């Protein structure tokens, strides 16, 4: 090598040894630094592995706090008592016994949570994930009061009884949990299990007021990826206002027997997604009698009707486009009359259409993002109306 005078300098064995020692020392220091950073990271983010075999202690979920129910029922996981209320078709009878929109609120410091569920898991659809139709969807409240998704799970088989490990390896700190129930499976029992010695107690209801919502498959949550992603559920988590869902896929047609149920629902306000399923002729025949029945049952309470959304499947289907346009036009014309004729009746417009027109699963139902857009579009409209009635 060259020295400072441009002359060739021979590296002696001693210099080579010192260079090697310097290199080795630097490498050793680097290894120590990496190890120290690793230990610091582990200290900042400790691990709490769940034991392989846990003898869980179970509590029936109905002994905790159930929210989102429109009325009391003999089976706490049903939405409507189908012994008391008649007129439903076989499909409707099953739908109103499914706990769509119902959630369990509890507090626990358990490092893992197990579920024992008994129910009817027979319904299947290409457009709805099993995690939504059969699954349980867990959120945990953050320090700032917001809800953060934690974990979900669904039975993999249709056996009536199933045991599932919902979540594990959590820190043993107290957590406020919000567990959404399946949108299209009837439950006869749900037990929540925690580790021995852990606390499991009913949580305080996290949402205020009672706003009932009757609607179609959109309100039911069809094509959501998870049970807690319907637009009414997203609205509750975002605003803190409790929505009580009576979404019935394909069956929200302004029927008199559904009006009978809603007449008995004690709520602060009533929202309807009632123009998505019926055709124009049915809307024309049933809308005003439906409004008059509910106004008589709930005088002074707001009745808020939503126009149906644009279905992406109609873009190139000329027949579907004509049908959809006809019922939207009928809803517009009749609701223009209704809001003038009836006090406390309102009409709002949702929008689930993304800029690229891709927020759909099957051309009819939005995906999670589409339902988020729906929720965002009605939020300011609903809040403005609800505020007039002291619902904030």
Label every model-predicted segment.
Residues 298-302:
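A short helix->loop->beta-strand "cap" motif at the edges of active sites that frequently abuts
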């Amino acid at each position: 090598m060259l020295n400072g005078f441009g002359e060739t300098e021979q590296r002696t064995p001693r210099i080579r040894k010192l260079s090697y020692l310097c290199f080795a020392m630097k490498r050793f220091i680097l290894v120590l630094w990496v190890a120290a950073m690793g230990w610091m990271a582990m200290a900042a983010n400790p691990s709490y592995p769940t034991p392989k075999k846990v003898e869980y202690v179970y509590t029936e979920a109905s002994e905790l706090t159930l929210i989102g129910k429109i009325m009391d029922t003999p089976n706490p996981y049903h939405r409507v008592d189908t012994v008391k209320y008649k007129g439903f078709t076989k499909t409707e009878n099953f739908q109103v016994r499914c706990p769509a929109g119902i959630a369990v609120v509890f507090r626990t410091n358990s490092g893992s949570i197990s579920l024992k569920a008994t129910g009817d898991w027979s319904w299947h659809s290409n457009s709805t994930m099993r995690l939504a139709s059969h699954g349980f969807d867990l959120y945990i409240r953050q320090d700032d009061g917001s809800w953060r998704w934690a974990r979900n799970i669904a039975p993999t088989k249709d056996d009536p009884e199933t045991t599932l490990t919902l979540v594990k390896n959590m820190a043993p700190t107290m957590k406020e949990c919000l567990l959404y129930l399946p949108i299209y499976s009837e439950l006869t029992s749900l037990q929540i299990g925690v580790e021995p010695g852990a606390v499991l107690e009913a949580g305080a209801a996290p949402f205020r007021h009672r706003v009932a919502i009757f609607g179609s498959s959109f309100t039911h949550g069809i094509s959501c990826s998870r049970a807690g992603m319907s637009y009414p559920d997203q609205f509750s988590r975002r605003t803190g206002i409790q929505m009580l869902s009576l979404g019935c896929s394909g069956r929200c047609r302004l029927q008199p027997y559904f009006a009978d149920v809603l007449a008995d629902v004690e709520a602060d306000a009533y929202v309807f997604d009632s123009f998505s399923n019926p055709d124009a002729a049915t809307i024309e025949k049933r809308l005003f009698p439906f409004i008059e029945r509910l106004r008589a049952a709930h005088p002074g309470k707001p009745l808020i009707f939503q126009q149906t959304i644009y279905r992406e499947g109609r873009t190139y289907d000329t027949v579907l486009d004509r049908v959809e346009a006809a019922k939207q036009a009928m809803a517009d014309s009749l609701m223009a009359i209704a809001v003038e004729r009836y006090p406390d009746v309102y009409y709002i417009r949702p929008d689930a259409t993304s800029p690229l027109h891709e927020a759909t699963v099957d051309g009819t139902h939005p995906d999670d993002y589409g339902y988020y857009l729906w929720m965002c579009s009605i939020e300011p409209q609903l809040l403005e109306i609800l505020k007039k009635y002291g619902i904030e």
